[in-house]
Structure formats: structure tokens, C-alpha cells
Amino acid sequence: MNKSGSLGMGLHQALSFSKPMMRVSRGEAVFWPGCALMGLDPAILERTRQCLERAEPGIGLSSCCCGQPSRYLFPGAHQARQEKLRRLLEKQGVKRIYAACPNCTQELEGLGEYQVLPIWPVLAEHVGPEDIQGPGGPATLHDPCPMRKDAICQQAVRRLLALADVTLTEAARCGENTRCCGNFHMMRALDPDKSRVMRQARLGDLPAGLPIVSYCEGCLDAFRGEGRRTIHVLELLFGQSQSRGWGNRWAFTRKGKA
């Protein structure tokens, strides 16, 4: 792992597992965006929660990190952070987690104590034409590699994009044949050179003249680093984010109840 990556992710994980950043609404169900997606405008995430509420009345919010970066970058700290997260979820009475992030979905399933539901099939059943506020238009789709075997989520995302009036050009490799963005298991920090090779290979599958849409904000961040235009599925549903970053994450965090 390079030094700058180590310092940056070390600070990220320390902040993510600090008390002010770990907020979970009291109740049986929460919407869990994940670290990267909390960088979008909070209004987009609130619209997402409202649509999920049609399936899960009273659903709350979680601003927590799943801890996957610590698993691969700081294994000595991972177990303690996982226990801290488990105690908070137990204290707040959480039983069901509606996860937006593919990596969070996998990590939270590993806890073994909660029903973890990807949000995409739920949204596909409960978002209507009247909810759409995105720009529509042509795009190409990147299926995140953690979702490679999840045909239900893949098809749900495509139904949502059709509803949002997106003219989709499929990647050369998609669905179960998708390729990694170069950051699986924190590869960008652990081996930047290998990560870049993987990312360039994946970008070769995606038509150069089209914006890349995905349901993983971490993947999109990697592609933006290579100069590609990107947009998250939630932005195509509920409006484009005017900014990205920790300011938005903090604003979202304040909506949760400690």
C-alpha cells in the first residue's frame, strides 16, 4: 500500500467510526447508503428513503460505514470496529438494512445477524414516473463486480433506467461477465499500478462517447479519476447532485438519531 493511500484511508476509517459520524435511527429498518454515496446531495438520499418507505413504512437512516476498508487495509482494527457497529445496530433495534452500496451489501451480510436487502428491486417496484427528476438521455452501464451474480438487482436497475428515460448502450462485458473497476477489496490503495491496469481494461468495455452510469459510487469515483463522465443511478431517478464530498456526508449524518 502506498503511503498517501494509507494515510488517507486511515483518516477516512478513523472518522467513519468516530461517534459523531455513526448515527442510526431507532427502529427495525434503516436505509444504508454507504460512505461514498453519502457524498451526494442529501436531498437525493432523502427521496430514495421516501420511496423505500412505500415498502417499509417508518424506515430510518444509517450514516455508518460497513468497515470493509478496514478489513483489507487495517485488519488489526477491523474486529473492534465491527463490534462497535454491531453494538450500535443492536442498541437501536435494527433488524433490516436496505443497502445501496454493493460492497456494503456483501460486508453487512457477513455480520450474519441482519436481513440485508439491496435497494434496487425495492425501488423498481415502488418508483413511478411522477418521481423521476433526472436528466435522462444516452448512457452506458457498468455493473459493479460484487453484483456480478445478482441478476435480480441487475434487471431492477435496468427497469429503473428505462423508467428514467435513459437510452442505454450495454457495455461489451456486462451482467455476470462484468469486469472490475480496479478497486475491488481496496485495490486502488493496496496496489495502485495493478488497479490502474484493471480500470483501463474495464474502460475499454465502455463506449468512450457516453457517460457511465452505475449503482456503485465507488466505481464511478474510480472512472472519474480517469477523466470519464459519470452519473449514479439515483441521480438519474431523483436529480443530479450539485456537489460531492464530506460536507454532504455530514449533512446526511445529522439526519440520523444517535
What are the language-model segments listed below?
Residues 1-113, 248-258:
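Iron-sulfur-cluster electron-transfer modules
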